[in-house]
């Protein structure tokens, strides 16, 4: 088997949701890294580990903008990183203003097809 198509860091505090996203993305040939919170994600981002996409929940451990804050820190560390947000909550204009420019948001619950379309779109951007 060849090299993975992309390395995707999944940041999700809900274990089941994170594991399903991991399995789904791996089924398409991508490599995944997973983190349950901002601190764990930042340890990956500060390492030499290649990462192409940050796929992060917006609400992490009751931090209303945890994923948005993480994305800004991630882009500061890795300007070439692509970001895909996810949330089960309504995304308001106020929330969108916190997004890193040029990013997308996938609304939960999402289907594997919707996740795949979003990952493909983010990688193509």
Task: Give the location of each predicted region.
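C-terminal output helix
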Residues: 110-122
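Acidic, metal-coordinating helix/loop segments flanking the phosphotransfer/catalytic sites
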Residues: 22, 34-53, 61
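Conserved phosphotransfer cores of two-component systems
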Residues: 46-49, 73-81, 98
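Two-component/phosphorelay signaling modules centered on CheY-like receiver
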Residues: 15-33
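Conserved acidic carboxylate
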Residues: 12
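Conserved phosphotransfer microenvironments
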Residues: 57-72
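As written
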Residues: 96-106
